[in-house]
Each structure stands twice: as C-alpha cells, then as structure tokens.
C-alpha cells in the first residue's frame, strides 16, 4: 500500500512538473498582504456566523442535559435541510451577481428563495409530528414545538443571505457585511449572557434566541442596504 502511494505521488509530480511544466513561485509580500486585507472581512464574518449558529447546542448541553441536546440537534438537522435550497441557489448565482452586479436580478432570486423556504416551512409545520416520529421513533411534543420555532430562521436566512453575502459582498461592501455579522455575534453573546445571569436558559429560550439573532440580522441588513441605496 505504501509503495502504491509513493508511485501515485511520483506520477502526480511528474505530470504536474514534467508534463504540464507547472512552476512554483514565491508570492511577493505586498501581494500576500493585499490578499490578507481583502479576505479578512469575509473570514471575520464567517467566524462570527459560526459562533452564534453553533454555540446553542453547547449551551444546552452545559446547562440542561443530553436529552435536550438530542431534541435540539434533531430540530437543527431539519433546519439545515430547509436551508439547503437557499444555500445552493445563493452559491449558484454568486458568480453571475459578482459579474453583472444587477440588483434587480438579486431581488428576483431572493424572492424565489423566500418562496421555496416558505413552502418548506409550511410543509414542516404541518408534518413536524411525523418528522419527529420518523427521526426519534416516538412522539415528542417538545421536539415538534422546537422544530416549528427554529424553522422560522430558515425563512429569515433565505432573506439575509441575499441582503448580505450575495449583495453587500459582490457589490464591494465586504467591510459593511463584516460589521453586521460581528454585531449579530455580539447581540447573541449579550443575550445569552443575560439568560445565564437570570437563570432563564431553557430549550425554548435558546431556540427563541436563535430566531431572534436572525431577526436582528435582518433588521441590520435592511438598514445597511437602505443607507447604501441598495
């Protein structure tokens, strides 16, 4: 097996360096610094988003228990499926948006994404009991409620994606987008801190907070787009 790996490695190097004549070169420090400055807002934005999206399960596990974590995780997995169409659409049209910078096209795709998210949410809302039984093997009323509450954020995410990452970023406002995402993260951490100080951390309050962050993000993005005339 090791010999096979070495053979594959050597063959790959021969093709890249010998046949295709690819040559490696050191990037000038000035270009590296410029690329770093350009990518920093997006890096900070993604990091901030990951914090307020993924910390919920950690908080529930730390303050409540594994049963609550499993219930929230089940609802979160359904939420990820609901977000998937909007995410795929956003990725597919991003090159076209960056190239043409057509706000009318962005709005058209955004409303299409919202419509799909609404359809998914309505289906999930009326079929949540069946989904819980399918995934858990039993009826859990709390899981159905959490799933319905958390599903609202799928609609908000489909809007926020086209107000932020697919509008501000390709139109040259990456730093504005970064400030909005950092603001969302700070809002989430502040609200979670207040819940902790008041002893109000429950599965329902954490879920409402997750939706509340998306509402805050929506308001922030609408305000920023309005100020920029987008």
Place the predicted regions along the sequence by residue.
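Helix-loop junctions and terminal segments of transmembrane helices
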Residues: 79-102, 164-170
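Interhelical loop/hinge segments that connect adjacent transmembrane helices in multipass membrane
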Residues: 9-53, 92, 96-104, 227-230
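Interfacial/gating helices of multi-pass transporter permease domains
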Residues: 31-38, 42, 58-80, 140-145, ...
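Short, small-residue-biased leader/transition segments that mark boundaries at the very start
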Residues: 3-8
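Transmembrane helix-bundle signature of multi-pass secondary active exporters and lipid flippases
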Residues: 49, 72-91, 120, 150-157
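Membrane-interface junctions at transmembrane-helix termini in multi-pass inner-membrane proteins
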Residues: 98-99, 154-182
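Interfacial segments at transmembrane-helix termini and the short loops linking adjacent helices
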Residues: 126-158
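Alpha-helical transmembrane segments of multi-pass membrane transporters
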Residues: 9-14, 117, 124, 179-203, ...
């Amino acid at each position: 097996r090791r010999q096979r790996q070495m053979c594959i490695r050597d063959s790959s190097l021969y093709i890249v360096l010998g046949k295709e004549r690819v040559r490696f070169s050191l990037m000038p420090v000035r270009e590296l610094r410029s690329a770093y400055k350009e990518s920093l807002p997006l890096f900070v934005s993604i990091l901030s988003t990951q914090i307020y999206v993924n910390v919920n399960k950690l908080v529930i596990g730390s303050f409540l228990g594994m049963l609550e974590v499993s219930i929230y995780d089940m609802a979160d997995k359904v939420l990820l499926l609901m977000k998937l169409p909007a995410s795929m659409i956003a990725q597919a049209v991003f090159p076209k948006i960056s190239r043409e910078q057509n706000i009318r096209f962005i709005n058209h795709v955004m409303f299409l994404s919202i419509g799909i998210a609404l359809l998914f949410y309505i289906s999930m809302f009326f079929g949540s009991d069946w989904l819980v039984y399918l995934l858990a093997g039993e009826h859990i009323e709390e899981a159905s409620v959490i799933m319905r509450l958390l599903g609202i954020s799928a609609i908000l995410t489909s809007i926020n994606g086209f107000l932020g990452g697919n509008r501000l970023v390709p139109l040259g406002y990456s730093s504005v987008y970064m400030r909005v995402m950092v603001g969302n993260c700070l809002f989430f951490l502040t609200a979670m801190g207040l819940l902790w100080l008041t002893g109000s951390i429950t599965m329902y309050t954490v879920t409402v907070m997750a939706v509340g962050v998306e509402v805050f993000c929506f308001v922030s993005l609408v305000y920023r787009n309005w100020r920029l005339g987008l």
